[in-house]
């Protein structure tokens, strides 16, 4: 990707890229300390920046050569917790029925959820 995201790929985008979410994704969602915004990026498409509190911006690793090279991407457990936080804070439901949770690291998921003040209800 040829832009500076000022954050890391997360939410449904990271979950889909890592095989945890079955749904087709129509935008790249990026967790950021900046403001919420949406932009069409040539060669990328729709990019949505979602503001998270600074203390919740953790748990990301370098993207692979196939998925988001040169960018940071949330671990599957962090992406799920970011999505849970977003749904809880904005008043919509987590798409539990579309998630494949069996391969997630349960310990990492619970630790991340605890650090973010979330409760896992799966």
Q: Which residue stretches match the model-derived regions?
A:
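Hydrophobic alpha-helical interaction segments
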Residues: 58-122
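Short gly/ser-rich loop at a beta-strand->alpha-helix junction or flexible surface loop bordering the NTP-binding
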Residues: 1-61
């Amino acid at each position: 990707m040829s832009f500076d995201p000022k954050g890391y790929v997360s939410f449904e985008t990271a979950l889909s890229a890592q095989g945890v979410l079955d749904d087709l994704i129509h935008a790249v969602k990026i967790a950021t300390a900046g403001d919420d915004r949406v932009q069409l990026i040539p060669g990328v498409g729709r990019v949505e920046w979602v503001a998270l509190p600074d203390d919740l911006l953790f748990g990301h690793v370098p993207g692979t050569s196939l998925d988001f090279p040169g960018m940071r991407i949330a671990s599957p457990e962090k992406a799920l917790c970011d999505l849970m936080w977003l749904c809880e804070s904005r008043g919509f439901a987590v798409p539990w029925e579309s998630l494949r949770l069996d391969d997630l690291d349960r310990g990492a998921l619970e630790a991340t959820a605890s650090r973010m003040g979330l409760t896992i209800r799966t």
